[in-house]
Structure formats: C-alpha cells, structure tokens
Amino acid sequence: VGPYFDRFLTRWPTVETLAAAPLDAVLHAWQGLGYYARARHLHACAQAVVARHAGRFPASEAELRALPGIGDYTAAAIAAIAFDLPAAAVDGNVERVMARLFAVTAPLPEAKPELRRLAATLVPAARAGDYAQAAMDLGATLCTPKKPRCVLCPWRENCRGRALGFAEELPHRRAAAERPLRRGVAFWAVRPDGAVLLRRRPEKGLLGGMMEVPSTDWRAAPWPVAEALA
C-alpha cells in the first residue's frame, strides 16, 4: 500500500490541490488503496476544508466531525495527534484494551459509548497525541484479540480483566445476524467494436458513483429469465 499512497500524495500534496482535482481522477489514483468510498470522502473533505476553513483543518472535535467522512474516531485522532489536544481516539484496538482494563462485559456494539467514556478518563492533558498512538499500538501489538502478551503490558497490574481471569474473552460481541441471500441478474452487452455497456451507480449508497454492468434489482426470490429481461 505504501508506494500507492506515496504516488497519491505526490500527485496531490496539499488540501488545495486535492480539492481542485476531478473526482474521477482521484478515484482512479486510489486504485490499490482500499475502499473507494474513502477516496470520495477524502475528496469531499478537502473541498469542505478549503471552502469553510481556508485550507486549514480545524482543531476542535466538533468542527472536525462536521466535515464529510469524519466520525468520532477520526475527529479525536486528528485533534490529539495533529493538534495535541486531550481527545480520546478510540479504534477497535483501544476498545479491546479498555474492555479488558476495566472488565467491561457488556457486548459490542452496545458497550461502545461506555468504552469511549472510560478511554476519555485516561487521556493526559499533555502529549495527548503520543498517548493516542501508544494506546492504539498497545492494542495492536500486546493486547491482541488472541493470546495477549499480558506479561509485557505496562497496565498489567491495573487490568481488572486479567485479575478476574477472563481478559482474553473480552470484549464480548453480540451474535451477528444471519446474512440474507439476495439474487439478481447482470447483463453483459458488447458492441461489435468491443465496447461494453456500463452505467454509473447512484452517488449515495453502496459503491456510490462507481461504474457497473446493468442488472436487475436484488431480491430473495430467483429471477426467471423472461422477467429479468422484461
């Protein structure tokens, strides 16, 4: 991923250059970097920062959350790491650390607000950015989902989950609902010159704005050929 991202940053090194770029060019350059929705949000966010904040990211979590594509975690991470403000950046790694440290047995996702609250109680007034990155690294390297390396953890003496003997079981998760099966029919239409018929998906929703082959709607019942072609 690194070389792809380096090329992306070389092409658009500033918020202003990214904001001025055509969306299609940004999406094309995002190939190999993950979900295209992230590129769309990044582009929209750059445009909002230029239009609303003269090209400079705001420092407050509230203003950051008002930008496209930025939620609680990203807003807190920017506030802490970029501006060294005391904000609790809670990703999946930090959720796991907090659940074990405080022995929170309520399942996810219901436990998320409580885990964020507990995480906020530990954020120092100084060097908040260093702490945010250290907490995430702790979850990624020591307080791992399986076989946590508790003997090396700097919080091992204060960990309630470890003291109670069930740290590795945490956090609990609510059983996932069974995924429904949906069926559809896709159409492959090719001109004599080899061009393939494509259409653009709606801007909102799954894979918004991406190109696809035409298809029917998706439903539980099978599609008879005659009905699909109607």
How would you label these PLM feature ranges?
Residues 137-230:
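Intrinsically disordered, low-complexity, charged terminal extensions of DNA damage-control enzymes
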Residues 1-169:
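Catalytic cores of DNA base-excision repair glycosylases
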